[in-house]
């Protein structure tokens, strides 16, 4: 029973990766120790089918609960305390980086190619994500665009470190999606997002499973590069994105509070990583 409840809680935490800017559901799944099993199940669904279904049912329940429970308070906090919330998120991500670095060398030692891969990914993904607003603009909240949103959410699960909420903010789909989650809009929001997510999981899960099994170190160094760049970007104002972080009018006390929440976030990230080592 405790194991079942623990998996429900893991699902709730992973759901945060769908709705928090800068957070990746895949990273959270990796931190909580279920990422590789999830990828293996998606890539080979008929292998240990019953065992895996029973394992992931409470995770799925937790994800639905997490989306329903956190959409409204997160929307409120981002509207009223954006700077403090985003810095605490960034701290939590930074706190998990040591765990990802440790995981990256689980099967082989780190070499110069790994480091080059990490920093190249950091630079290219950072510049690409920052410029995305100026290239594609924003999208309306339509059925097809929510299918795209679902595909991005699924990629955020398949590719740890990729924050779909960051991309949805840039595309202008984040706020409409959050509103749909908050009101449990099944046909207008959940259904198209489910179509996009399901199709993406089916198409890309085998590719990710192959990459992890054959290029484990390279994949994780790519992940770390994206984690670092996406974390940096949520802390930098972007003139092309009206929903990006804003520091206007912040006092000295405000910066002290930022430092406190950043440190608190780092502690939370480290604690989550320790939970992975203990309970995965």
What are these regions (language model features)?
Residues 1-20, 24-280:
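Multi-pass membrane proteins that catalyze or facilitate reactions on polyprenyl-/lipid-phosphate substrates
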């Amino acid at each position: 029973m405790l194991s079942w409840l623990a998996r429900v809680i893991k699902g709730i935490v992973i759901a945060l990766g769908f709705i928090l800017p800068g957070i990746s559901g895949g990273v959270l799944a990796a931190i909580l120790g279920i990422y590789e099993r999830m990828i293996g199940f998606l890539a080979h669904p008929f292998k240990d089918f019953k065992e895996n279904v029973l394992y992931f049912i409470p995770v799925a329940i937790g994800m639905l609960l997490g989306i329903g429970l956190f959409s409204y308070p997160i929307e409120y906090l981002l509207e009223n305390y954006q700077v403090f919330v985003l810095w605490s998120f960034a701290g939590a991500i930074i706190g998990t980086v040591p765990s990802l670095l440790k995981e990256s060398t689980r099967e082989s030692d780190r070499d110069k190619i790994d480091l080059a891969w990490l920093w190249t990914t950091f630079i290219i993904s950072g510049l690409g994500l920052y410029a995305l607003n100026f290239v594609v603009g924003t999208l309306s909240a339509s059925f097809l665009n929510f299918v795209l949103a679902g595909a991005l959410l699924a990629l955020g699960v398949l590719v740890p470190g990729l924050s779909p909420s960051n991309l949805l903010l840039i595309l202008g789909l984040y706020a409409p999606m959050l509103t749909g989650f908050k009101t449990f809009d099944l046909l207008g929001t959940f259904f198209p997002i489910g179509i996009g997510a399901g199709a993406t999981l089916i198409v890309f899960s085998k590719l990710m499973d192959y990459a992890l099994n054959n290029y484990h170190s390279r994949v994780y160094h790519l992940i770390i590069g994206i984690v670092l760049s996406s974390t940096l970007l949520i802390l930098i104002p972007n003139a092309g994105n009206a929903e990006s972080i804003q520091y206007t009018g912040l006092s000295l006390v405000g910066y002290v509070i930022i430092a406190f929440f950043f440190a608190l976030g780092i502690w939370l990230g480290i604690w989550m990583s320790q939970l992975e080592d203990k309970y995965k």
